[in-house]
């Protein structure tokens, strides 16, 4: 029987050391901090959260919800993060949900917490047009991988010095300058006023007679036409010079002549009044047989049914009976 060999395992069954961190973006220094911005739907998936903290070091990584930052429930520390990653999934599954929450209020809260040179990215490297515009308005610079916060130049005050040459020249001069001679005193005289002077320049720059040529003077001046107020009838002015009064008068005259012609059509001649005017003596009706004094009339007489009467005699009809 061959001898048996027994080996002893000295490795611990449970290792307390943290798992090696895997960072998608090489930070170059373990002290750089990363901020993960997650949409609200990722909070219900424990496997996604577990995978995130296996890929990022917990000691240098913070996780915040986009909806809480947008509502103002979270205050981020200023000038802290070197990398901000928006969790949209590598295939862009949560892109619309995450980018919808990247409003101006969120950018206002993110930019102060970013260090100079910090980067803002998404997992699928995609930003919409509205998100890019808000990022640029917030002060970020667009790069190939996302957006970056540029280093703000330091401002310092520069003291302004006065020109010292004048002071040095003033110090070297020890003598007082000689006083300038006083101007001679003019004697007081009485001024004369010329009333004929019109205080105008006699030199005319433009001759007003040459402004209009002979052709301009011969050209008729067309006055503006009188326009009535809205909702009112067109009427000519009292001293109308545009021709509107004459035009309206001609229109009225034409309408008057037209009305007179219409009246003349219905006017009866003297011969046509025989049947109507009973005062005409020696006239017969249109039948040519019966006169006013005839007691018996023919069938075609217009006076049929009327008794004999004299010219000028008044005829009254009472109860369908002629009364002479």
From Swiss-Prot:
Short motif Cx2C motif 2, span: 298-301
GO molecular function, one term: electron transfer activity
Motif Cx2C motif 1 mapped to chain: 287-290
Residue sites binding [2Fe-2S] cluster per the record: 226, 237, 240, 242
One GO CC term, this protein: mitochondrial intermembrane space
Listed cofactors: [2Fe-2S] cluster; [4Fe-4S] cluster
Domain of life of the organism encoding this protein: Eukaryota
Region (N-terminal SAM-like domain): 28-158
Subcellular location: Cytoplasm; Mitochondrion intermembrane space
Pfam families for the chain: CIAPIN1, DRE2_N
InterPro entries: Anamorsin, CIAPIN1, Dre2_N
Binding site for [4Fe-4S] cluster: 287, 290, 298, 301
Chain positions covered by the region annotation Linker: 159-217
Alphabetical UniProt keywords: 2Fe-2S, 4Fe-4S, Cytoplasm, Iron, Iron-sulfur, Metal-binding, Mitochondrion
Location of the region described as Fe-S binding site B in the Swiss-Prot/TrEMBL record: 287-301
Assembly and oligomerization: Monomer. Interacts with tah18. Interacts with mia40.
Family: Belongs to the anamorsin family.
Record comment regarding domains: The C-terminal domain binds 2 Fe-S clusters but is otherwise mostly in an intrinsically disordered conformation.
Protein name: Fe-S cluster assembly protein dre2
UniProt gene name: dre2
